[in-house]
């Protein structure tokens, strides 16, 4: 009997993009179900009653929540394809450290670029650039964060890359000028079929931001 895999997601979510990419990397067929986050569906509320957030991966009726946990789950359930996490315990721990760093740091500062104004906006932009520089330092001259192999940390971060042009537009700055190696890394990642299929067009994200502000009641002149 074939596995039933359902993904409850929202197209601009950089967290959902992670799960899409992980599934694509493993060639796992899945039923993508777009969610309205302002009118949450019964299945989303049933499958993630604690946080009521996307993405939710449903495997044979069992929900798995939180995107980084989903990447690990996918890697363990479908191990035959190229592993997403290193087998070495230390390298695995390091990958998880950087995944956690991305989760805790990147979104919070990036959100201030399009969702705040004045001093808060400028502080968010400054912190965001500093965070990207920290990540660029970890990347160094490697092809991917894990070396020559695309994996966990790349998947954790690459969804934000689809938002980079929006951050630049609403923040009036150039990420490439600040972090050229990180931009080169993003371009390499997008050449992968799994990433290209999973990331939305940057222009679509830019057009979505004013709509998102309106939905959230954010007024920025």
Swiss-Prot record:
Q: Identify the Pfam families for this entry.
A: GST_C_2 (PF13410), GST_N (PF02798)
Signal sequence coordinates: none
Catalyses which reaction(s): RX + glutathione = an S-substituted glutathione + a halide anion + H(+)
Modified residue annotations for Phosphothreonine: 149
Cystines in this chain = none
- Annotated residues that bind glutathione are located at 13-14, 39-40, 53-54, 66-67
Domain annotation GST N-terminal: ranges: 3-82
Task: Please verify whether the record's keywords include ATP-binding.
Answer: no
Q: Where in the cell is it found?
A: Cytoplasm, Cytosol
* Gene3D superfamilies associated with the record: 1.20.1050.10, Glutaredoxin (3.40.30.10)
Its GO CC terms are: cytoplasm; cytosol
GO BP terms: 2,4,6-trinitrotoluene catabolic process; glutathione metabolic process; toxin catabolic process
What keywords are annotated for this sequence in UniProt?
Acetylation, Cytoplasm, Detoxification, Phosphoprotein, Transferase
Q: Which residues form the GST C-terminal domain?
A: 88-208
Q: What is its EC number?
A: 2.5.1.18
Q: CDD domains annotated for this entry?
A: GST_C_Tau (cd03185), GST_N_Tau (cd03058)
N-acetylalanine modification sites? 2
Give the record's family classification. Belongs to the GST superfamily. Tau family.
Role according to the record: May be involved in the conjugation of reduced glutathione to a wide number of exogenous and endogenous hydrophobic electrophiles and have a detoxification role against certain herbicides.
The name this protein goes by in its record? Glutathione S-transferase U25
């Amino acid at each position: 009997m074939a596995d039933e895999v359902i993904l409850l997601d929202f197209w601009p979510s950089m967290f959902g993009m992670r799960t899409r990419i992980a599934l694509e990397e493993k060639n796992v067929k899945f039923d993508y179900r777009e969610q309205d986050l302002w009118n949450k569906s019964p299945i989303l509320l049933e499958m993630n009653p604690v946080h009521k957030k996307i993405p939710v991966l449903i495997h044979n009726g069992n929900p798995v929540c939180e995107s980084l946990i989903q990447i690990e789950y996918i890697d363990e359930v479908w191990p035959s394809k190229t592993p997403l996490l290193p087998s070495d315990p230390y390298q695995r721990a390091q990958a998880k450290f950087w995944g956690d760093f991305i989760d805790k740091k990147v979104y919070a500062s990036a959100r201030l670029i399009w969702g705040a104004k004045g001093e808060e906006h400028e502080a968010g932009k400054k912190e965001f650039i500093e965070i990207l520089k920290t990540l660029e330092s970890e990347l160094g001259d490697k092809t991917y964060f894990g070396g020559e192999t695309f994996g966990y940390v790349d998947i954790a971060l690459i969804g934000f890359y689809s938002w980079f042009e929006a951050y630049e537009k609403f923040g009036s700055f150039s990420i490439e000028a600040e972090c050229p190696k990180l931009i080169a890394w993003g371009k390499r990642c997008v050449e992968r079929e799994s990433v290209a299929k999973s990331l939305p067009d940057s222009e679509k994200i830019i057009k979505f931001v004013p709509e998102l502000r309106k939905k959230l009641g954010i007024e920025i002149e």
